[in-house]
Every structure is written in structure tokens, then in C-alpha cells.
Amino acid sequence: MSKYYKIAIALAVSTFAIGTTEFVPVGMLTDIAKDMHVSTGMIGLLVTGYAIAQAVGAPIATSFVGRIARRRLFTWLMFLFAVLNVASAVAPSYGLLLVTRAFTAVVHGVFFATASVYLTNMAPLDKKGEAASWLFGGLTVATVFGVPFGTYLGDVVGWRATFAVVGAMGLIGWFGVLIQVPKSVAPSVSDNQLLGIITVIRQPRISLTLLMATLGFGATFVLYTYIRPYLQQVTGISTTSVVWVLVLYGVFVTIGNVIGGRLANRQSLHILMGVFLAQAIVQIVQLMLLPKAGWYLLGVALLGLVAFMGNASLQSRIIITTTELAPAHTDVASALNVSALNFGIAGGSLVGNMVMSHVGLQTLPIVGALIGLLAIGVAQLVRRY
């Protein structure tokens, strides 16, 4: 096995821990809400707030780490990630839990942004598109094993134990980076990149791609953030069954990510538009599948298949485009794309909460599909540049 693949696996192990902590509250909304004496909608902010903190904080924080060698940066980030998850496990109040989650989100964003650029630069020429799929692979495998296991652990032992275990996962990621990422890796830049944020977003091709990422990724989170109450209230399945349905979802997310990684090597905008269209169609199909016994499994599988399929293309497109238009600011551009994806999570979750509160759970797929169609419209604008 080449050194590139060993490093890719070590970074993917780290993003597995990161993906688990990002999405595991989705499966524990009811339990955390009960323990903290707040509504399920408020606990949904643990997902939305995480995404917002990452979206706002990651580009700013990333702009200050350019002088740090990658191995040192990655190990410190994973150690801090572990500490913050333990802090979440012992948080005595909802407010403090939100704070620890926010700081964890910033660490997540910086790690993912810098690791994406690092791995893309290391990849062979014909594999640069799929380099980001290794990191997204860690996130998607987290949806298969990490999130369902965390949900199960939360049901059996308590949600605090789940965060403590995720902290231990972070230490495993720290160790993997420590032994695989070479010390000789030089810092990617030699100066502060804070002004690079402005430089990057002033490029229409980049800023429109970021908007496309927000809409395209956010479309699926209108429904996914509230998939547990949807399955329990609309489909009518038990709490135990939800865990296994989340496993099914995660399996198909992983399959979709692998397919998306291969597609990313083509760097085709038409492929991204096709993914967004598929997401919209799949959401509409949920109206027919999710309420029906047995058929809801097909609905969840299709939803998982398309959910992350475009992410590797979006991440690699930003890195490669920025290398062409603003080569000194690839780390910041990568962080901005991570922000765009998380604005999508936050926006999708927030819109989903509003729809759930004022219209009803059954309307979530329709709203998600409409947002996906907006992403296709923005992709048409990107073609002009």
C-alpha cells in the first residue's frame, strides 16, 4: 500500500469520529430534550448550531493556521476534538452543551478543510477528484456505524456516554495521524490568509459554486435532520427500528459517496446537476414511500444514496478552481466550501424545523425538493463563468 493511501486512511479514521459527533444528535434528539428539559426543536439546534459555528468559525480559524506543519496541526486538532467531546459528555446545561458543540464544530471545519487540500495535493493526477471522497468516506461510514451505534448507546446507557465514546474515537484518529502523516510535510502557506477570504469570494465562479453547495447539500437535511420523529410519527415504527433504519441509510450514503468519488474525477458540472435533480426526485418519492409499511425502507435507502453523492465533486471543484484563480488561498477556499456545506445543513435543518412546527412533518420532502431545484438553477449560472 502506498504512503498516499495510508495517510488517506488515517485521515478518514479521524473524519469518522468527526462525522459521528456531528450527526449523532439526530438519533438522540428525544433523549437529550428530555434530559435537558427543552423541546425537540430546540435540541435540533445541536445540529443546526454545530453547522453554523463550523460555517462561520472554520474559514476564520483556518486563515491563521497556514504556518503550522500539517502533522502538528492535525494531531493538535484531533486531541482538542477529543477533549471537547468529553466536555460535551459532562455539560450540566443546554447552554454549555451548545458552547462545547460550537467549539467542536470549528475544530471539525479546520481539520476537514486543511486535510482536503493536503490530500488533494498528494493524490496522483487522475485521482485528485476523488481525494476528498476519502474524508467524506469517514463521514459516511460514521452514518453507517457511528451514528446508529451512538443512538443505540444513548438509548441503553444515556446520551452522555455517546459523547464520551466519540472522544475516545478522536484519540484513535489522533494516533493514526501521528504515525502516518510525515513530519517533513511543510506548511501549505507562509502567511496569514484572513484577507484571502475576501479574495476568494470575489471570484464569481467560486462564490456561485459555494452557493450551489449550500443549496444542494442543504436540500436533503430538511428531512434528514428530523428523520427520527418523521419515521416514528408518520411511518409509525418503533425506537429500536429507527436505529436499524439509520444503519440502512448510512450504508447507502457510503455507497453514494463511493460513486460520487469516481464521478468527481471527471470534474463535470453536468454530473453535479444530475445529482441535484436526483436528490429532488428522491425527496418527492418519499411522500409515497415513507408512510407505507415496508416501502419506507426503499425510501430511506434512496435518500441515503443521493445525500452525499455530490460532495466530493463540490470539494474538489473548489480546490482545483481556486488553484487556478487564487492559488495562495486554497486552504481558505476549502474551508469556505466546508462552510457552504454546513450552511446547507444549518439552513436545511432550520427550514425543516419551521416547516415541522408550522405546516407538518409530511411537507418536509416537498420543501427539500424545491431547494434541490434551486441548486440546479445556480449550477446553470456557474456554467457562464
Please name every model-derived segment.
Residues 7-43, 58, 223-228:
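Extracytoplasmic
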Residues 9, 80-87, 92-104, 294-302:
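Paired small-residue
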Residues 56-95:
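Conserved MFS/SLC helix-loop-helix module at the cytosolic interface between two early adjacent transmembrane helices
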Residues 167-186, 379:
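C-terminal membrane-cytosol helix-exit motif in multi-pass small-molecule transporters
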Residues 206-247:
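Extracytoplasmic gate region of multi-pass secondary transporters
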Residues 321-359:
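A late C-terminal transmembrane helix in Major Facilitator Superfamily
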